[in-house]
C-alpha cells in the first residue's frame, strides 16, 4: 500500500511520529463505524466516535482529505444529536474545505437563524462549481467517497431556497426551490415552500416530463447507485445524485497535491459584510441554461431584492422544465362577477356548511334536519327596543379563519383492517407515482390558494380511496378544507379518523382544538388538551389546545397565558399569536389584540386571519375605513371566504355605501348558498332599505337553513307583518317566542303590532 505523505508523521496507535498501513486502516475503520452508527440511528455512539476521529486527525494538515472527512463526520454527528450550536461552530471554521461541511453549516444556520448570509455565500460557491461543469478534484473526491448524508444538487438548491426565505427574499427562494424541483420532482418540501409563497409551477412538466426522464435514468444506473452493504466494512448507500452527471470529467483517483476545495476561479467570495451583495447574483452558467422567468408583482407581501441587479438575473434564471410565477395576492384578487364563475366551476360539496355564526360560540344539534343553531345570544335580551334583538345577534367567527390544516361518513371500519377487493386492486392501485404526486401537488396548490371546493373535488375524484382513508396527510387536508368552508361536521369526522390512526399526534391539533371550540364540545376538547399535556407538554400545539379549552370555559385571562406559552415555545407560531389576539379582543383589550395580530403577520404575511382580527378591532373602535382596508387585505389572500366578504359588506354598510354592501352580500350568498351569515346580513340590509319583498324571500331561506334560531323567525315574522301577512307573522313570532323565552318582551311588542293591524 502506498504511503500517503500527509499521514507520514502520524500514528494512531501510539501517537509517535511514524506512519504505517495500520494507522490508515484505523482511520477508515473509525469512519465506517461512525457512519454505521448514524445509519442505525445510534447518534450518541456516532458523536463519541466522531470526537475520537476528530481528535486523532487534528494534527494533520488542514488541507488533508482525512482531516476534512473527520470534521464532516463530527459536525454531522453533532447536528443529528441536536447539538446545533456546537455543530455550527465546528463547521463554520472548515466549511470551505468540504461539501458536506458546508452543507451542515447551512443546515445549522437555518436552524439557529445565525450566519445565514455566510451560509448562502458558501453554498452558492459550491453550486457555481457544479454549474460550470468543473472537474474540481476535491469535490469529485467527496462525491466518490461514499460518505453518509452527502447532499445531492437538488437538496443543496432546496437548502439555499430555505435560507433565502429566512431572509425574506422570496424571489430568490422561489428560484432555488424551482431548481430543486427541476432536478428532483419528488422533493416535496420545495413544492410546499413554493405554495407557501403563492407561486405557481408547471406541474405537468415537473411530474411527467422531468419525472419520466429521472425514472429512466434511475433504472439505467440502479446497480451503481446502491452498492451492497457489509457489516465488516460499512459502505453507506451513495446518493443517486445528479452531480455525477454534471461532473462528466469526474476523477476517482485521489490527488494528494490538492489541498483546497475551491481553487482559482472556484474559490468562494469573501464572507465580509461588503461581499454580501454577491449573494444576489446567480452564476453565469445558470443564466445561460435557463429560459423560463419568474414574474413578480409589486406588493407588500412579496419581498423585493435589495440589489436591483437581481431582478434581471433572476428573470432569466429559471430552469427550462419549470415555470414559476410569483403573484401578489392583491394583484390576483378577482371581481365579484369572476368569483361567482369560479364558484360555479368548483362547486362540489354534497354536505354544505350550515352553521349560524355568532360570538357566543354556541352549538346545538337538531336530529331532524342536521342543522346547527349557534345563535342564543338573545336569551339575555330584555330590552323593549325592536332593533335590540337584531343587533344582539352577530356572526363573527374569528377562529374559523386561519392560514396556516375523522372518521369518514361512509365507513366505520378500522383503517388498519381494510379489506381490498380485486376490483380495487385493478383500479385504485394502478395509479403511477408521477400521477399521484401530480394530484397531491394540485391539491396542495388549491389548498394554499384557499380554493377549498376544488381541492375537495380533487380528493374525491383523483385520489384512491385506500390512500385517502389511511394517509394522515390526506385526512389532515380534508379536515382543514372542510373546516375552512365552515363544514364542521365533515371536518370533525376527518379529524376523528386522524386521531384513530395517530392517537399521539400533536401536529395540526391546534386546528382540531379550534374545531371543537366552534362545536362547543368541552368534553372532547378537554380530553384532547389533557392527553397532549401528558405526552407532549413542551409543544406549542399543546398549549394552543389548552388555550382553546380555557377560552371555551370563558377563562380568557388563563387562555391568554396559555397562548403566550405557545409563542414562547415557538416564536414563529403565527396561529398562536392570532388566537391570543382573539382572547384579548374578547376582553375588550384592542391595543393588546392588535399587537398580537401584528406579531402573527410578522411571522406569516399570508396569515389572513390576523388581518381579519385587525379589521374587527378597528370596527369596534368605529374606524370603518381602516377596517375595510384590513378586510380587503384579508380577502385578497382568501378571496372566496364568505365571512370576509360579509365583513367587507358590513364595513361598507357602516360607511353608508349600502348598494355596494349589498353586492358583497349577494356574492357571499352566491358563493355559498347555505351560508346563514350571508343570508342574515343581506336580509337585514334589504329590510333597512325597505325592499321588503326581497328581504322576505331572503328571511324565508334563512329560516330553512336555521329552523331553530329565534332571531331568524323573529325577522321573518316582522317582515310578514310589514307586507301585510298578519297570520303568517303571528305564526313566526310565536315560534320565535317558544325558541327564545327570555326574549319574550321584544317578540310580544311585535305581536301587539300585528294585532293592531286591520
Curated annotation (Swiss-Prot):
Keyword Cell division: yes
Matches recorded under InterPro entries: TPR-like_helical_dom_sf (IPR011990), TPR_rpt (IPR019734)
Protein location: Cytoplasm; Nucleus
Post-translational modification (record): Phosphorylated by CDC28, which is required for the early mitotic activity of the APC/C in its CDC20-bound form.
Cellular component GO terms, alphabetical: anaphase-promoting complex; cytoplasm; nuclear periphery
Top-level taxon in the UniProt lineage: Eukaryota
Subunit: The APC/C is composed of at least 13 subunits that stay tightly associated throughout the cell cycle: APC1, APC2, APC4, APC5, APC9, APC11, CDC16, CDC23, CDC26, CDC27, DOC1, MND2 and SWM1.
Protein known as: Anaphase-promoting complex subunit CDC27
Gene name in the database record: CDC27
